[in-house]
Structure formats: structure tokens, C-alpha cells
């Protein structure tokens, strides 16, 4: 994920300045979260006998991931 995108996310959260290490740490966390949501989405598409992951799979995968974290 581009550093500028990660910096922008952190700044949207209210930070005025962002260290390189903070950007790297958030980028790693976002990648791990994205991989988990993608895995769930793949399982949903396979359950529906499809090889293509759709936007609905991703939205449902995110919803399931979010519920599992509560």
C-alpha cells in the first residue's frame, strides 16, 4: 500500500504528523486485515460454486470479519 495513502488515513483520524514507522505499521496491519477479508470472501464464492469473488462477497466477508472481532 502506498505510504501516501496510509499517511492520509492516519491524518483523517486527526494526526498532524505521521512517522515512517507509524505508516509502515498501519500498512502491515491493513494488509493482514485485507488478507483475512479476502480469505473469507474466497470461501463465500466457493460456497456459491463460483471462482470469481464479487463485491457482494467482499462486503459480506467484511461484515463477517467485523462481527468476529466484537
Predicted features, each with a name:
Residues 1-70:
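Terminal helix-to-tail segments of small alpha-helical proteins
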Amino acid at each position: 500500500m502506498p505510504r501516501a495513502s496510509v499517511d492520509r488515513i492516519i491524518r483523517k483520524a486527526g494526526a498532524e504528523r505521521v512517522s515512517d514507522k507509524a505508516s509502515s505499521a498501519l500498512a502491515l496491519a491493513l494488509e493482514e486485515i485485507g488478507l483475512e477479508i479476502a480469505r473469507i470472501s474466497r470461501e463465500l464464492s466457493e460456497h456459491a460454486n463460483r471462482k470469481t469473488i464479487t463485491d457482494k462477497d467482499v462486503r459480506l466477508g467484511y461484515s463477517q470479519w467485523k462481527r468476529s472481532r466484537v
